[in-house]
């Protein structure tokens, strides 16, 4: 079984999603996980790390160190399900080939539409001549990430004024 398939199968069984898998120099194996309903906390990373350590040992996978992490605020979008889940969010997209001389776009993601396997994704962005819509397929994407939204007031309780 391929390493990514092995890890993804294990994570699905635990109720998590594999966002990204990275093999780095010196035997480092990085696994980025998510849980769509609740997000990720440190206890999730610990639990997954313990389970993957056992699975990788049993499967005789060669690695020196394992890191399990959340995908972060600027989470990558890779699968069609990611583009569906984050429709309405602000994203940064880099296309493989330029469209009208431009490869990098930042805008609001529209839900994918079209026939299965030929879905088109929309991105509403501010063009040179005003609001514009870019349509592209997942295969056109080099990189896509959420634009982090940081709300420093989000942790304040209502009625607790200073």
UniProtKB/Swiss-Prot annotation:
The keyword Cytoplasm applies. Its main location: cytoplasm. Keywords: Cytoplasm, Ribosome biogenesis. Disulfide bonds: none annotated. SUPFAM superfamilies: YhbC-like, C-terminal domain, YhbC-like, N-terminal domain. Pfam families: DUF150_C (PF17384), RimP_N (PF02576). One of its GO terms (biological process) is translation. It is found in: Cytoplasm. Coiled coil: none annotated. Required for maturation of 30S ribosomal subunits. This is Ribosome maturation factor RimP. It comes from Cupriavidus metallidurans (strain ATCC 43123 / DSM 2839 / NBRC 102507 / CH34) (Ralstonia metallidurans).
């Amino acid at each position: 079984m391929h390493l990514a398939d092995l890890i993804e199968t294990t994570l699905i069984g635990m109720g998590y999603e594999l966002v990204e898998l990275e093999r780095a120099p010196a035997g480092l194996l990085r696994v980025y996980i998510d849980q769509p309903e609740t997000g990720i906390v440190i206890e999730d990373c610990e639990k997954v790390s313990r389970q993957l350590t056992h699975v990788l040992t049993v499967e005789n996978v060669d690695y020196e160190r394992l890191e399990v992490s959340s995908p972060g605020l600027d989470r990558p979008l890779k699968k069609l399900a990611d583009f569906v889940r984050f429709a309405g969010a602000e994203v940064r997209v880099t296309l493989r080939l330029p469209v009208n001389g431009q490869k990098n776009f930042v805008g609001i993601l529209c839900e994918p539409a079209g026939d299965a396997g030929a879905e088109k994704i929309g991105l509403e962005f501010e063009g040179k001549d005003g609001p514009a819509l870019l349509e592209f397929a997942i295969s056109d994407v080099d990189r896509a990430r959420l634009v982090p939204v940081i709300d420093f007031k989000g942790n304040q309780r209502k009625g607790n004024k200073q």
